[in-house]
Amino acid sequence: MIEADRLISAGGTQVEEVADRAIRPKLLEEYIGQPQVRSQMEIFIQAAKLRGDALDHLLIFGPPGLGKTTLANIVANEMGVNLRTTSGPVLEKAGDLAAMLTNLEPHDVLFIDEIHRLSPVVEEVLYPAMEDYQLDIMIGEGPAARSIKIDLPPFTLIGATTRAGSLTSPLRDRFGIVQRLEFYQVPDLQHIVGRSARFMGLEMSDEGALEVARRARGTPRIANRLLRRVRDFAEVKHNGAISADIAAQALDMLNVDAEGFDYMDRKLLLAVIDKFFGGPVGLDNLAAAIGEERETIEDVLEPYLIQQGFLQRTPRGRMATVRAWNHFGITPPEMP
């Protein structure tokens, strides 16, 4: 199983990136959820504009699909500057980064997605650029090689990562602003789904938006993906109108249950409950029982189940919680 193949995967595709671009909020006043991030960024941006400075470098981290790219776009729009976008894996050589930096206008935003995947050579170039707005470049090779300094205009680097712990300390310490995006609450997701439905020209009730939001695993990207599939169902089965009942029927047909679990989530939980009496069960045994790689369980399946309180990691192995038993209508065993 590949994470990208799952309807409830938080990872995005190129097609979704294009589709989502049209419905993304452009300004902070349109930004839904993340109230602490929103209020802090409003202050930081206004202060930078009052001083006539570039915004401090910004690190955004958190699970995939929560709007790191959206926030970077909003920052550039609020500052009234250009946004240049790239990603860690694309910047293979120091020259790749140097080319982007030397093309920036004053106060522009350079957005590097997956910044934790920068190579050490490229990262070294970033240090003086972030700290002193200078590039140190080596010209020539061998004994004739010499270093030259190129002045850069003041700019803002926005780095995005799902793995803040993978950043080196020297890089992490150069960000003046650090923001963590949290999973969204259902009311905020309902608002996002309703807004997206209006942009897509859909007839959708508040209850229909709530049904999609409940199953979106706290993630706007998943919410918008589910909305598109519910739209397809509604257009074929119900003349396009989306009620709570139609949304529920569509998502049930797609095997996304009331908790946002798909077939693989349920398969894992039921294996722990049925085959191992609720656990504890070792990771290798669990992987063999459901026919998956242990890395898939650790990196793809487990995190959301643990976050939502359906699965526990213990020193002796994985255990299903009482909430997991109740989800399937099975009476949990009495604790000794």
UniProtKB/Swiss-Prot annotation:
One of its GO terms (cellular component) is Holliday junction resolvase complex. It is found in: Cytoplasm. One of its GO terms (biological process) is DNA repair. GO terms for molecular function: ATP binding; ATP hydrolysis activity; four-way junction DNA binding; four-way junction helicase activity. It is an enzyme of class 3 (hydrolase). Its EC number is 3.6.4.-. Residues 258-336 are annotated as: Head domain (RuvB-H). Keywords: ATP-binding, Cytoplasm, DNA damage, DNA recombination, DNA repair, DNA-binding, Hydrolase, Nucleotide-binding. It comes from the Bacteria. Pfam families: AAA_lid_4, RuvB_C, RuvB_N. Mg(2+) binds at residue 69. DNA binds at residues 294, 313, 318. InterPro entries: AAA+_ATPase (IPR003593), AAA_lid_4 (IPR041445), DNA_helicase_Holl-junc_RuvB (IPR004605), P-loop_NTPase (IPR027417), RuvB-like_N (IPR008824), RuvB_C (IPR008823), WH-like_DNA-bd_sf (IPR036388), WH_DNA-bd_sf (IPR036390). ATP binds at residues 23-24, 65, 68-70, 131-133, 174, 184, 221. Residues 4-184 are annotated as: Large ATPase domain (RuvB-L). PANTHER family: HOLLIDAY JUNCTION BRANCH MIGRATION COMPLEX SUBUNIT RUVB, PTHR42848. Belongs to the RuvB family. Homohexamer. Forms an RuvA(8)-RuvB(12)-Holliday junction (HJ) complex. HJ DNA is sandwiched between 2 RuvA tetramers; dsDNA enters through RuvA and exits via RuvB. An RuvB hexamer assembles on each DNA strand where it exits the tetramer. Each RuvB hexamer is contacted by two RuvA subunits (via domain III) on 2 adjacent RuvB subunits; this complex drives branch migration. In the full resolvosome a probable DNA-RuvA(4)-RuvB(12)-RuvC(2) complex forms which resolves the HJ. Has 3 domains, the large (RuvB-L) and small ATPase (RuvB-S) domains and the C-terminal head (RuvB-H) domain. The head domain binds DNA, while the ATPase domains jointly bind ATP, ADP or are empty depending on the state of the subunit in the translocation cycle. During a single DNA translocation step the structure of each domain remains the same, but their relative positions change. The RuvA-RuvB-RuvC complex processes Holliday junction (HJ) DNA during genetic recombination and DNA repair, while the RuvA-RuvB complex plays an important role in the rescue of blocked DNA replication forks via replication fork reversal (RFR). RuvA specifically binds to HJ cruciform DNA, conferring on it an open structure. The RuvB hexamer acts as an ATP-dependent pump, pulling dsDNA into and through the RuvAB complex. RuvB forms 2 homohexamers on either side of HJ DNA bound by 1 or 2 RuvA tetramers; 4 subunits per hexamer contact DNA at a time. This is Holliday junction branch migration complex subunit RuvB. It comes from Citrobacter koseri (strain ATCC BAA-895 / CDC 4225-83 / SGSC4696). The lineage of its organism: Bacteria, Pseudomonadati, Pseudomonadota, Gammaproteobacteria, Enterobacterales. The gene is ruvB.
